Swiss-Prot record:
InterPro entries: AAA+_ATPase, AAA_lid_4, CbxX/CfxQ, DNA_helicase_Holl-junc_RuvB, P-loop_NTPase, RuvB-like_N, RuvB_C, WH-like_DNA-bd_sf. It comes from Methylocella silvestris (strain DSM 15510 / CIP 108128 / LMG 27833 / NCIMB 13906 / BL2). Residues 257-348 are annotated as: Head domain (RuvB-H). Pfam families: AAA_lid_4 (PF17864), RuvB_C (PF05491), RuvB_N (PF05496). Homohexamer. Forms an RuvA(8)-RuvB(12)-Holliday junction (HJ) complex. HJ DNA is sandwiched between 2 RuvA tetramers; dsDNA enters through RuvA and exits via RuvB. An RuvB hexamer assembles on each DNA strand where it exits the tetramer. Each RuvB hexamer is contacted by two RuvA subunits (via domain III) on 2 adjacent RuvB subunits; this complex drives branch migration. In the full resolvosome a probable DNA-RuvA(4)-RuvB(12)-RuvC(2) complex forms which resolves the HJ. Mg(2+) binds at residue 68. This is Holliday junction branch migration complex subunit RuvB. The lineage of its organism: Bacteria, Pseudomonadati, Pseudomonadota, Alphaproteobacteria, Hyphomicrobiales. It comes from the Bacteria.
Length: 348
């Protein structure tokens, strides 16, 4: 199968140099996630006052909300070294040992996609997190022996979009679990205006608002949309990004007024037109769209659920009346499922 082109509003797409330049460098410059920022500030100041390593931190939530950025900020605020890797890269115990033995006291090791760690590697990580020791088996067969290696007292920061896939023993070893939430339009406006200042882009408040409304609650997408709108404005000779300029550019980019793109609409239309609005299983949807199940569950569905377009029920995915209205389609009559009857009769 030919590789699919990158969606402009894909929150998990790899960041380029321009996106990296928009990242805030300090907690005070970080917009949004007020509760997470306030708590982190307390934990960081307490650790610095005690001259101890910060307790292990787990950031979890949808992609593009700032998990990596916050991890870097934590290391910078602590005044320590920052080392970064990801779960799939640490294939064997030796890979993990190489990362851990290179750390100094209070350094930060960041593991992105920590839910994808090899189970054998995860077992070795437990004593490293709890006792700051590595338990390695050297050799094979009768001559094999166990070796303990003392480690510096470090801070592990894990990031995941799927906290439910973490094993309980690993999840319980993080003393500071922090869930990141989607951003409000007002917060994204601030992020867009800051990005415009960094990139020297003239932008009106209404233009920033228009981009923020279509950024799906995600700073990474907001920055990407800002740069693409800038391109249209430059080619069209517009001196400033106004609401009209942003609207025209985003319409040409096929991003509608609430941030849905062609893939989102295709997903909704498939359920509406091919499966009568549901319920329909995610595997069936994946086959119909020729998309992997993980992409549907991690990338497409979360925002649609948050916007009230989609329900996950025991029998499968179902579109809401809101989704049919957005698509401009008549909602077909459907028999009430047992799930819906119970939802109407009590708490959801």
């Amino acid at each position: 199968m030919a590789p699919q082109p990158r969606r402009l509003i894909a929150p998990d797409a790899r960041e380029d140099d321009a996106e990296l330049s928009l990242r805030p460098l300090a907690l005070a410059d970080f917009t949004g996630q007020a509760s997470a920022r306030a708590n982190l500030k307390v934990f960081i100041e307490a650790a610095k006052a005690r001259r101890e390593a910060l307790d292990h931190v787990l950031f979890w939530g949808p992609p593009g909300l700032g998990k990596t950025t916050l991890a870097q900020i934590v290391a910078r605020e602590l005044g320590v070294n920052f080392r970064s890797t990801s779960g799939p890269v640490i294939a064997k115990a030796g890979d993990l040992a190489a990362q851990l033995t290179g750390l100094e006291d209070r350094d930060v090791l960041f593991i992105d996609e920590i839910h994808r760690l090899n189970p054998a590697v995860e077992e070795i990580l437990y004593p490293a997190m709890e006792d700051f020791q590595l338990d390695l088996i050297i050799g094979e067969g009768p001559g094999a022996r166990s070796v303990k290696i003392d480690l510096a007292k470090f801070t592990l920061i894990g990031a995941t979009t799927r906290a439910g896939l973490l094993t309980t023993p690993l999840r319980d070893r993080f003393g500071i679990p922090i869930r990141l939430e989607y951003y409000t339009v007002e917060e994204l406006e601030c992020i867009v205006r800051r990005g415009a200042r960094v990139l020297s882009i003239p932008i009106a408040d209404e233009g920033a608002n228009e981009i923020a409304r279509r950024a799906r609650g995600t700073p990474r997408i907001a920055g990407r949309l800002l740069r693409r709108v800038r391109d249209f404005a430059a080619v069209d000779g517009d001196p400033e990004i106004t609401r009209a300029v942003a609207d025209r550019a985003l319409r040409l980019l096929d991003v509608d007024h609430i941030g849905l793109d062609q893939m989102d609409r295709r997903f909704l239309q498939t359920i509406a037109l091919s499966f009568g609005g549901g319920p329909v299983g995610v595997e069936t949807i994946a086959a119909a769209l020729s998309e992997p199940r993980d992409a549907i569950e991690d990338i497409i569905e979360p925002y649609l659920i948050q916007q009230g377009f989609l329900q996950r029920t025991p029998r499968g995915r179902m579109l809401t009346s809101h989704a049919f209205r957005h698509l401009g389609l008549a909602e077909p009559p459907r028999e009430k499922t047992q799930f819906q009857l119970f939802s109407e009769g009590g708490e959801e």
